[in-house]
Amino acid sequence: MDDVDRGLLNEIQTGFPITGRPFHDLGVRLNCSEEEILTRVRRLKRKGIIRRIGGNFDSKRLGFATTLCAARVPEEKIRKFIKVVNRYPEVTHNYLRDNRYNIWFTFVARSSELICRYMKEIKEQTGVKEILNLPAVKIFKILVDFDLD
């Protein structure tokens, strides 16, 4: 990664232009052509440095329910459990952790009732009964910017 890549990553985290030609505008800011910016973004995506470019929305204000789930999954069931959980498009994150509760994942769905239904389905499909439903009571921070300079 060179200085232009780092500058590009800094810009697109929170300063992505909402215009007809955002990559052109990024190029102007970074003294590059639109095509060079597009080439760099594609390369950074291929390398897995950029996962996605898109908006972040306040799910609560849009009427969605969210929760953090912690599951106690026996080692021999981990693969199946992960596959079942990942089938749900409402799952936004899914992590293996070194803890008694070793799988942690988040749900964002139309209602908390729907989340409970999905959790019941996951329990039935995997045989894992110990899944904690930990909805947030208060959000203290949800944004992170990585300063790459």
Where are these regions (language model features)?
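A compositional/biophysical signature of low hydrophobicity enriched in polar/charged and small residues
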Residues: 1-149
